[in-house]
Protein backbone atom coordinates (compact mmCIF):
# COMPACT_ATOMS: atom_id res chain seq x y z
CA UNK A 1 0.00 0.00 0.00
CA UNK A 2 1.47 3.34 -1.08
CA UNK A 3 0.98 6.46 1.05
CA UNK A 4 -2.01 8.73 0.43
CA UNK A 5 -0.19 11.10 -1.90
CA UNK A 6 -0.91 11.60 -5.59
CA UNK A 7 2.78 11.85 -6.47
CA UNK A 8 3.44 8.54 -4.69
CA UNK A 9 0.38 6.67 -5.99
CA UNK A 10 0.67 3.95 -8.62
CA UNK A 11 -0.39 4.87 -12.14
CA UNK A 12 -3.00 2.46 -13.52
CA UNK A 13 -1.87 3.19 -17.08
CA UNK A 14 1.67 1.96 -16.43
CA UNK A 15 1.15 -1.06 -14.16
CA UNK A 16 2.83 -3.23 -16.80
CA UNK A 17 5.47 -0.75 -17.92
CA UNK A 18 8.17 -3.42 -17.81
CA UNK A 19 6.23 -5.57 -20.29
CA UNK A 20 5.62 -2.83 -22.88
CA UNK A 21 7.55 -2.49 -26.11
CA UNK A 22 9.73 0.60 -26.42
CA UNK A 23 7.15 2.23 -28.69
CA UNK A 24 4.27 1.40 -26.35
CA UNK A 25 6.18 2.87 -23.41
CA UNK A 26 6.94 6.03 -25.37
CA UNK A 27 3.31 6.48 -26.42
CA UNK A 28 2.19 5.96 -22.82
CA UNK A 29 4.69 8.46 -21.42
CA UNK A 30 3.77 11.00 -24.06
CA UNK A 31 0.07 10.61 -23.25
CA UNK A 32 0.76 11.10 -19.55
CA UNK A 33 2.92 14.16 -20.23
CA UNK A 34 0.10 15.80 -22.17
CA UNK A 35 -1.83 16.14 -18.91
CA UNK A 36 0.81 18.43 -17.40
CA UNK A 37 0.18 21.75 -19.23
CA UNK A 38 -3.56 21.31 -18.68
CA UNK A 39 -2.95 20.90 -14.95
CA UNK A 40 -0.71 23.98 -14.93
CA UNK A 41 -3.40 25.96 -16.73
CA UNK A 42 -5.75 25.44 -13.79
CA UNK A 43 -3.22 27.22 -11.55
CA UNK A 44 -3.13 30.42 -13.65
CA UNK A 45 -5.32 32.40 -11.19
CA UNK A 46 -2.88 31.61 -8.37
CA UNK A 47 0.16 32.25 -10.56
CA UNK A 48 -1.26 35.62 -11.59
CA UNK A 49 -1.24 36.73 -7.95
CA UNK A 50 2.27 35.35 -7.45
CA UNK A 51 3.70 37.17 -10.46
CA UNK A 52 2.01 40.49 -9.72
CA UNK A 53 3.45 40.40 -6.20
CA UNK A 54 6.88 39.37 -7.48
CA UNK A 55 6.95 42.26 -9.96
CA UNK A 56 6.00 44.71 -7.21
CA UNK A 57 8.70 43.41 -4.86
CA UNK A 58 11.34 43.32 -7.61
CA UNK A 59 10.67 46.98 -8.39
CA UNK A 60 11.24 47.77 -4.71
CA UNK A 61 14.66 46.14 -4.85
CA UNK A 62 13.57 42.71 -3.70
CA UNK A 63 15.00 39.47 -5.02
CA UNK A 64 13.42 36.31 -6.40
CA UNK A 65 14.68 33.28 -4.50
CA UNK A 66 13.92 29.65 -5.34
CA UNK A 67 14.51 27.00 -2.68
CA UNK A 68 14.11 23.25 -3.00
CA UNK A 69 15.71 19.82 -2.75
CA UNK A 70 16.59 17.25 -5.39
CA UNK A 71 14.92 17.78 -8.77
CA UNK A 72 12.89 20.70 -7.41
CA UNK A 73 16.02 22.46 -6.21
CA UNK A 74 17.87 21.81 -9.46
CA UNK A 75 15.04 23.32 -11.49
CA UNK A 76 15.15 26.45 -9.34
CA UNK A 77 18.91 26.79 -9.78
CA UNK A 78 18.54 26.25 -13.54
CA UNK A 79 15.87 28.93 -13.93
CA UNK A 80 17.86 31.43 -11.87
CA UNK A 81 21.03 30.77 -13.88
CA UNK A 82 19.25 31.24 -17.21
CA UNK A 83 17.93 34.66 -16.20
CA UNK A 84 21.44 36.16 -16.26
CA UNK A 85 22.08 35.81 -20.04
CA UNK A 86 18.41 36.08 -21.02
CA UNK A 87 17.46 39.19 -19.06
CA UNK A 88 20.84 40.61 -17.99
CA UNK A 89 19.94 40.20 -14.33
CA UNK A 90 22.55 40.35 -11.61
CA UNK A 91 23.31 36.82 -10.29
CA UNK A 92 22.27 38.09 -6.86
CA UNK A 93 18.82 39.26 -8.01
CA UNK A 94 17.37 35.87 -8.93
CA UNK A 95 18.83 33.07 -6.83
CA UNK A 96 18.41 29.31 -6.77
CA UNK A 97 19.17 27.47 -3.52
CA UNK A 98 19.33 23.69 -3.38
CA UNK A 99 19.53 21.52 -0.27
CA UNK A 100 23.10 20.31 0.07
CA UNK A 101 24.61 23.20 -1.88
CA UNK A 102 26.09 23.27 -5.39
CA UNK A 103 27.44 19.73 -5.02
CA UNK A 104 23.81 18.56 -4.96
CA UNK A 105 23.32 19.80 -8.53
CA UNK A 106 25.11 16.74 -9.89
CA UNK A 107 25.23 14.32 -6.96
CA UNK A 108 22.65 13.19 -4.42
CA UNK A 109 23.44 14.60 -0.97
CA UNK A 110 22.02 12.08 1.46
CA UNK A 111 19.61 13.50 4.02
CA UNK A 112 20.01 17.13 2.94
CA UNK A 113 16.29 17.58 2.34
CA UNK A 114 15.39 16.30 5.81
CA UNK A 115 16.77 19.28 7.74
CA UNK A 116 14.57 22.35 8.25
CA UNK A 117 17.37 24.27 9.95
CA UNK A 118 19.64 23.89 6.94
CA UNK A 119 17.25 25.97 4.82
CA UNK A 120 17.18 28.69 7.45
CA UNK A 121 20.98 28.82 7.43
CA UNK A 122 21.07 28.96 3.63
CA UNK A 123 18.64 31.90 3.59
CA UNK A 124 20.57 33.70 6.32
CA UNK A 125 23.72 33.30 4.22
CA UNK A 126 22.17 35.41 1.45
CA UNK A 127 20.91 38.02 3.94
CA UNK A 128 17.21 37.44 3.30
CA UNK A 129 15.08 40.59 3.74
CA UNK A 130 11.40 41.48 3.87
CA UNK A 131 11.61 42.77 0.27
CA UNK A 132 12.46 39.33 -1.10
CA UNK A 133 10.14 36.70 -2.61
CA UNK A 134 10.93 33.13 -1.54
CA UNK A 135 9.45 30.35 -3.68
CA UNK A 136 9.55 26.93 -2.04
CA UNK A 137 9.39 24.08 -4.56
CA UNK A 138 8.48 20.53 -3.49
CA UNK A 139 6.55 18.00 -5.57
CA UNK A 140 5.35 16.17 -2.47
CA UNK A 141 4.53 19.44 -0.74
CA UNK A 142 6.07 18.28 2.52
CA UNK A 143 9.86 18.37 2.12
CA UNK A 144 11.32 19.43 5.52
CA UNK A 145 14.01 21.61 3.91
CA UNK A 146 11.37 23.62 2.03
CA UNK A 147 9.11 23.78 5.09
CA UNK A 148 12.03 25.21 7.07
CA UNK A 149 12.86 27.76 4.40
CA UNK A 150 9.31 29.06 4.04
CA UNK A 151 8.79 29.16 7.80
CA UNK A 152 11.94 31.21 8.31
CA UNK A 153 11.10 33.52 5.40
CA UNK A 154 7.74 34.25 7.03
CA UNK A 155 9.46 35.33 10.24
CA UNK A 156 11.59 37.80 8.25
CA UNK A 157 8.50 39.25 6.58
CA UNK A 158 9.46 38.07 3.09
CA UNK A 159 6.80 37.13 0.55
CA UNK A 160 6.43 33.34 0.50
CA UNK A 161 5.18 31.14 -2.35
CA UNK A 162 4.85 27.36 -2.49
CA UNK A 163 4.74 25.12 -5.55
CA UNK A 164 3.62 21.53 -5.03
CA UNK A 165 2.07 18.72 -7.07
CA UNK A 166 -0.24 17.42 -4.35
CA UNK A 167 -3.48 18.89 -3.07
CA UNK A 168 -3.67 20.07 0.55
CA UNK A 169 0.12 20.15 0.75
CA UNK A 170 1.87 21.02 3.99
CA UNK A 171 3.79 23.87 2.36
CA UNK A 172 0.49 25.33 1.10
CA UNK A 173 -0.42 25.96 4.73
CA UNK A 174 2.82 27.87 5.31
CA UNK A 175 3.13 30.00 2.17
CA UNK A 176 1.22 33.24 1.66
CA UNK A 177 0.74 32.32 -2.01
CA UNK A 178 0.23 28.56 -2.42
CA UNK A 179 0.23 26.98 -5.88
CA UNK A 180 -0.87 23.36 -6.25
CA UNK A 181 -0.73 21.54 -9.58
CA UNK A 182 -2.18 18.04 -9.53
CA UNK A 183 -0.46 16.16 -12.35
CA UNK A 184 -1.51 12.71 -11.15
CA UNK A 185 0.60 9.61 -10.47
CA UNK A 186 3.95 9.35 -12.19
CA UNK A 187 4.67 6.90 -15.01
CA UNK A 188 7.34 5.44 -12.74
CA UNK A 189 5.85 5.39 -9.25
CA UNK A 190 7.22 8.18 -7.06
CA UNK A 191 9.68 9.46 -9.69
CA UNK A 192 8.75 13.14 -9.41
CA UNK A 193 11.49 14.15 -11.86
CA UNK A 194 8.90 13.20 -14.50
CA UNK A 195 5.45 14.87 -14.66
CA UNK A 196 5.95 16.81 -11.43
CA UNK A 197 9.31 18.10 -12.63
CA UNK A 198 7.82 19.08 -15.98
CA UNK A 199 5.04 21.00 -14.24
CA UNK A 200 7.54 22.79 -12.01
CA UNK A 201 9.67 23.76 -15.01
CA UNK A 202 6.65 25.19 -16.83
CA UNK A 203 5.67 27.18 -13.74
CA UNK A 204 9.16 28.57 -13.17
CA UNK A 205 9.34 29.54 -16.85
CA UNK A 206 6.12 31.51 -16.37
CA UNK A 207 7.18 33.18 -13.14
CA UNK A 208 10.61 34.37 -14.28
CA UNK A 209 9.63 35.29 -17.85
CA UNK A 210 6.47 37.24 -17.05
CA UNK A 211 8.10 38.93 -14.07
CA UNK A 212 10.90 40.12 -16.34
CA UNK A 213 8.31 41.37 -18.85
CA UNK A 214 6.72 43.29 -16.00
CA UNK A 215 9.95 45.04 -15.03
CA UNK A 216 10.78 46.17 -18.56
CA UNK A 217 13.24 43.57 -19.79
CA UNK A 218 11.21 42.68 -22.88
CA UNK A 219 10.25 44.75 -25.96
CA UNK A 220 7.27 43.19 -27.75
CA UNK A 221 8.49 39.59 -27.51
CA UNK A 222 12.20 40.40 -27.91
CA UNK A 223 14.93 40.00 -25.29
CA UNK A 224 15.78 43.69 -25.21
CA UNK A 225 17.99 43.29 -22.13
CA UNK A 226 19.91 40.24 -23.37
CA UNK A 227 23.45 39.90 -22.04
CA UNK A 228 25.74 38.88 -24.88
CA UNK A 229 28.16 36.34 -23.44
CA UNK A 230 29.00 34.61 -26.73
CA UNK A 231 28.96 35.21 -30.50
CA UNK A 232 25.44 33.79 -30.89
CA UNK A 233 24.07 36.28 -28.37
CA UNK A 234 26.02 39.17 -29.90
CA UNK A 235 24.41 38.35 -33.24
CA UNK A 236 20.99 38.12 -31.57
CA UNK A 237 21.54 41.48 -29.89
CA UNK A 238 22.35 43.18 -33.17
CA UNK A 239 19.39 41.57 -34.92
CA UNK A 240 17.05 42.78 -32.17
CA UNK A 241 18.25 46.35 -32.78
CA UNK A 242 17.91 45.81 -36.53
CA UNK A 243 14.37 44.46 -36.16
CA UNK A 244 13.05 47.22 -33.89
CA UNK A 245 14.73 50.10 -35.70
CA UNK A 246 14.08 48.71 -39.21
CA UNK A 247 17.69 49.29 -40.30
CA UNK A 248 20.45 47.21 -41.87
CA UNK A 249 22.54 44.74 -39.91
CA UNK A 250 25.63 46.92 -40.31
CA UNK A 251 23.78 50.00 -39.05
CA UNK A 252 22.53 48.02 -36.07
CA UNK A 253 26.05 46.78 -35.35
CA UNK A 254 27.34 50.36 -35.38
CA UNK A 255 24.70 51.39 -32.82
CA UNK A 256 25.51 48.34 -30.73
CA UNK A 257 29.19 49.26 -30.62
CA UNK A 258 28.59 52.96 -29.88
CA UNK A 259 26.20 52.02 -27.07
CA UNK A 260 28.95 49.85 -25.57
CA UNK A 261 26.93 46.70 -26.20
CA UNK A 262 23.74 47.91 -24.51
CA UNK A 263 20.76 46.81 -26.62
CA UNK A 264 18.32 49.11 -24.83
CA UNK A 265 20.48 52.19 -25.29
CA UNK A 266 21.25 51.29 -28.91
CA UNK A 267 17.55 50.82 -29.66
CA UNK A 268 16.56 54.19 -28.20
CA UNK A 269 19.44 55.82 -30.09
CA UNK A 270 18.30 54.27 -33.36
CA UNK A 271 14.60 54.96 -32.92
CA UNK A 272 15.03 58.56 -31.81
CA UNK A 273 18.19 59.56 -33.67
CA UNK A 274 19.86 60.69 -30.45
CA UNK A 275 23.21 60.29 -28.73
CA UNK A 276 24.19 57.52 -26.34
CA UNK A 277 24.09 60.00 -23.46
CA UNK A 278 20.58 61.22 -24.32
CA UNK A 279 19.31 57.66 -24.77
CA UNK A 280 20.75 56.69 -21.40
CA UNK A 281 19.09 59.70 -19.78
CA UNK A 282 15.71 58.86 -21.27
CA UNK A 283 15.91 55.29 -20.06
CA UNK A 284 16.89 56.45 -16.59
CA UNK A 285 13.94 58.85 -16.48
CA UNK A 286 11.49 56.20 -17.67
CA UNK A 287 12.17 53.26 -15.41
CA UNK A 288 14.46 51.60 -17.96
CA UNK A 289 11.40 50.89 -20.16
CA UNK A 290 12.38 51.21 -23.83
CA UNK A 291 8.94 52.09 -25.22
CA UNK A 292 8.51 54.86 -22.67
CA UNK A 293 11.99 56.19 -23.40
CA UNK A 294 11.22 56.29 -27.13
CA UNK A 295 8.01 58.24 -26.52
CA UNK A 296 9.77 60.65 -24.15
CA UNK A 297 10.14 63.99 -25.91
CA UNK A 298 11.02 65.97 -22.81
CA UNK A 299 14.26 68.00 -23.08
UniProtKB/Swiss-Prot annotation:
What are its E.C. numbers?
A: 4.2.1.126
* Keyword terms: Carbohydrate metabolism, Lyase
What this protein catalyses is:
N-acetyl-D-muramate 6-phosphate + H2O = N-acetyl-D-glucosamine 6-phosphate + (R)-lactate
Q: Which residues form the SIS domain?
A: 54-217
Q: Name one GO biological process term.
A: peptidoglycan turnover
Which GO molecular-function terms appear in the entry? carbohydrate derivative binding; carbon-oxygen lyase activity; ether hydrolase activity
List of catalytic residues: 82, 113
Q: In which pathway does it act?
A: Amino-sugar metabolism; N-acetylmuramate degradation
State if Lyase is listed as a keyword: yes
Kindly give the Pfam families that the UniProt entry links to this protein.
GKRP_SIS_N (PF22645)
Biological function: Specifically catalyzes the cleavage of the D-lactyl ether substituent of MurNAc 6-phosphate, producing GlcNAc 6-phosphate and D-lactate.
User: What is noted besides the main data?
Assistant: A lyase-type mechanism (elimination/hydration) is suggested for the cleavage of the lactyl ether bond of MurNAc 6-phosphate, with the formation of an alpha,beta-unsaturated aldehyde intermediate with (E)-stereochemistry, followed by the syn addition of water to give product.
Query: What family name appears in the similarity comment?
Result: Belongs to the GCKR-like family. MurNAc-6-P etherase subfamily.
Query: Subunit structure, briefly?
Result: Homodimer.
- The protein here is known as N-acetylmuramic acid 6-phosphate etherase
Give the originating organism: Staphylococcus aureus (strain NCTC 8325 / PS 47)
Amino acid sequence: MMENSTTEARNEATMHLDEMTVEEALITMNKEDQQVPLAVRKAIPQLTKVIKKTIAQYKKGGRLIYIGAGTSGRLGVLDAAECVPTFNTDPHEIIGIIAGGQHAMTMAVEGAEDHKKLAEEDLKNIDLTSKDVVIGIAASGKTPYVIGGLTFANTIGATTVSISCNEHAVISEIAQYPVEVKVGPEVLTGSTRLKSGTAQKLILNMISTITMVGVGKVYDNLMIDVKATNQKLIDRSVRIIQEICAITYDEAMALYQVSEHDVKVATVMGMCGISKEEATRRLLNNGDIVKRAIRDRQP
